[in-house]
Amino acid sequence: MSVAYGRGGRTIIMMTQYSIGADRSGYFHLCSDGALSPQFLICEDDFCVAFNLVGVCAANSGATILSFSLEDTHLHVLAYGTKESCVRFKTMYETSWAHHIGRSRGSRQGAVIDLEIIPVEEREHLLSAGTYIIIQPTKDGKQIMPYDYLWGTGSMYFRSQGHRSLWTVDSAGNRLDMVKAGDIPEKRLCDILASRRTIPGEWLICNRILLPDNYVDVAHFERIYQTANCFRVFLASSRSRDQEIQQRIASYRGVAMEDTEARKHCHEISKQLFGTTNVRLLDTIQRTQLAQELRSKWHLSARQIASLVLLKYSEVCKYI
């Protein structure tokens, strides 16, 4: 279902659904589970690195970033692209972040994140997810609004010309110097980005921040909402809308099932489809089909399915 706002404030409801194939572009909500990463971000340096890595991974994955936000325990991203490009983004981000905390802390306990990739196939879901992502860090009684939150993109949309970016002024409102990535010595740039992956040389960096203006497609995001009024309606998100997004996330994370029970179901489906319970005898296409059936019938997590059908986790993520 989609919502449009006509003259005189009339609300027009339309049903729209997107079909996202493996080779077709679509919208995806990527998010991590804060309960599994309570030590994700513990200092300002962590926030800077986690923030910058969104841009680094966007530049190298092919995924287009429309909105994102960071909290101390988790990350939310709205991306546009093929499923494959979003899987690349996910893998790059998780790997780069794990390397950073391994170097900076010496221990990765409670800090490693696992991003779920949730297809957004209905327009109502898209409208809700886009704003859910940028308002979550400012909820729960926090004394800040989305357009003032430094570690998200809430300040970027439907702004008047000439407005000052959050990341290019200091607390007194004075403009800070910006520098092109290509003008920064390679070692210094690697330290800022916490990555050796390359980014376009003309991208701007200010006060250790890789500016989101370089890679967040603001125009695309604004086209989703069409008007500032529509954006404002969804920004003032109701509790029921939030709960719907949260239920989608919980549902997509899959059922936590004991391995022995999950293996039993895997063998049963394999026997029905291919006449054998030995997954090792199946080819890649058959294992992929088995993975899809396990997801459809039992809604197991991608990680558990990968271990059952003996496929790489990244491969399973592409097709379920």
Region spans (language model):
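Short Pro-Cys-Gly-centered "Cys-loop" motif that presents a nucleophilic cysteine in a tight turn
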Residues: 2-69, 82-320
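Short beta-strand->loop micro-motif that forms the acidic, two-metal-ion catalytic signature
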Residues: 74-81
